[in-house]
Amino acid sequence: MLFREIVIAGCGNPLFGDDGFGPAVVEELKKLQLPDNVKVIDAGLGAPHFLFTLIEDAEVPVKKLVIIDIADFGGNPGDVTKLRPEDLPPGAYRDAHSWDLSEPLQRLKDVIDITIIGCQPKRVASHEFELGLTEEVERAIPKTVRIVLEEIGVEYGATINHQGTHLWASPGEAAGDTRDNPGEKI
């Protein structure tokens, strides 16, 4: 059951190489001190069920959903883009079981503000287990964390916990570029 207005869901399976990107970003986000109205979830492979039941089970209405996943948008491995449900052609966004996630997102978009943050994968294993992200996708995690924080209106510096477990607070790194064109690489 959900108790927050903003939900950040990392989708994917860490057993299949770069498909573990969403859960890896969620792991880093959980190290941060986020506002009480934000819920960070490792949705793993349960994304279809999660999306269908999101509204029905929420005690507090969910107003914003940020989905973090791999997305093959023709970029270079490790490139990151922001998409809206209307940017997805029907059938373009499928989970590991080939379930179409575009349709439930289309249904939810009029009730919830939905953003998909996708990282171009380099390698996704399909028949054998392959633990770990490729170097290019691993390097996209800090930028993605900053993009997520920007998307939910949280300043990065205010989120670092007192133990300093968040490893990449480099002052020279951009906080996530903004864009004017949907689906444009950021």
Regions picked out by a protein language model, each given a short descriptive name:
Residues 101-166, 171, 176, 183-186:
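Phosphate-binding/catalytic loops
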Residues 70-114:
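Helix-loop-strand module that forms the ligand-binding subsite of alpha/beta enzymes
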Residues 32-35, 64-68, 89-93, 106-108, ...:
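Glycine-rich loops and low-complexity Gly/Arg-rich segments
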Residues 20, 24, 45, 96-99, ...:
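Conserved active-site and cofactor/substrate-binding residues in soluble primary-metabolism enzymes
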